[in-house]
Amino acid sequence: MKEFDLVKAKVDIENIQMGTEGVIVHIYEGHAAGEVEFFDENDDTIDVVTCKFEQLELINERR
């Protein structure tokens, strides 16, 4: 996974429900985790959450 890839939460993460979509906005050194901006069906930001990549499913890879 890379910055700006579109992802979906595979599990509930803090206040983010499983299935919620988001965009990776930062990747930490070591590439095991990153910051993801999650948004609702109106594309409004819900929250920015630190996630392990194992908690995320890649929807669309940025090229």
Describe the residue ranges of each PLM region.
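Basic/aromatic-rich interaction segments and small domains that mediate binding to polyanionic partners
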Residues: 2-62
